[in-house]
Curated annotation (Swiss-Prot):
The keyword Glycosyltransferase applies. The active site is at D89 (proton acceptor), D262 (nucleophile). InterPro entries: ArchSynthase1/Queuine_TRR, TGT, TGT-like_sf, tRNA_ribo_trans-like. Pfam families: TGT. Its EC number is 2.4.2.29. This is Queuine tRNA-ribosyltransferase. Zn(2+) binds at C300, C302, C305, H331. It catalyses: 7-aminomethyl-7-carbaguanine + guanosine(34) in tRNA = 7-aminomethyl-7-carbaguanosine(34) in tRNA + guanine. Homodimer. Within each dimer, one monomer is responsible for RNA recognition and catalysis, while the other monomer binds to the replacement base PreQ1. It comes from the Bacteria.
Amino acid sequence: MRFERLAQDGQARRGRLSFPRGTVETPAFMPVGTYGTVKGMTPQSVKDIGAEIILGNTFHLWLRPGTEVIETHGDLHDFAQWDKPILTDSGGFQVFSLGDMRKITEEGVHFRSPVDGAKVFMGPEESMAVQRSLGSDIVMIFDECTPYPATEAEAKRSMEMSLRWAERSRIAHGDSPSALFGIIQGGMYPELRERSLKGLLDIGFDGLAIGGLSVGEPKEEMLKVLDYLPGWMPDDKPRYLMGVGKPEDLVEGVRRGVDMFDCVMPTRNARNGYLFTAEGTVKIRNAQHRYSTQALEADCDCHTCQHFSRSYLHHLDRCGEMLGAMLNTIHNLRYYQRVMAGLRTAIEAGTLTAFVEDFYARRGMPVPPLAA
């Protein structure tokens, strides 16, 4: 992987990630393909909305269908028929989301499979082995996602174990040609975040991710972390904000120097009839759309807006038709890609401030201040 910085406007960066399977223009949003598929989308339709990289879930693909099945095809690219880059998360977040079903030790995590109840173990070495089998272009280290809220002592213990697991992940990654990203933890505590970052830099990674956000904390707390943390990170490595989020969160992350994002929000909200537009969120199942012959968004170039009315989308949603979820997903993912393209163009032109002001004005929202 090669990362180039092409332009900068304030703290916001315009860059490019290059892989043998293709390039990714940054800032970039990665659609989430948990089971090797972006829900409701074919691989071609994911390309059509402008995505250049997708995210796969190590934990879920390991449990089902299993690496043995995927390896019979080659790797995840061959299995899912996606010939562009793939980032795989390590499985850590999903393991720690199991609550009482898991037991954390220094070695890793013992848990019962949510698929069949079998006893399973995953540690850094297992996670790296699975991601190697998947043929991931970007591999994430195995870490513990610090919960919110957490005391400073709890966040410190978690962060220190994640650093030890990061070193084991680095060793287990070995001579793999895939890029390996470290994950900064430390909860809401700047000193712990700084220690985590320094520890990861000492180990050495191709990119760095900000973990432990979008885990239930107020948005103000998230922005506090983003106000200082990206600025501490090296200029020559890509910066990835994990699991975030709303369109406004992407804009705020980019303003603070983040390069990469992923979130299930555009696909999950689409399946529930919540559609993103420049003027805000449209709840398509509301009765006001029943007779509307207008497109969902007049200036949107997605297949949904180019061919179907709000009335038809409303009808599909009320009937629970799968086409409704598919058309909604096409629009939401295209909307996210259009926001990212707008941010890239604005950074190149040095007009990010004007872009941000217009973005919030169309929503009737004030522009959140940046830290001095």
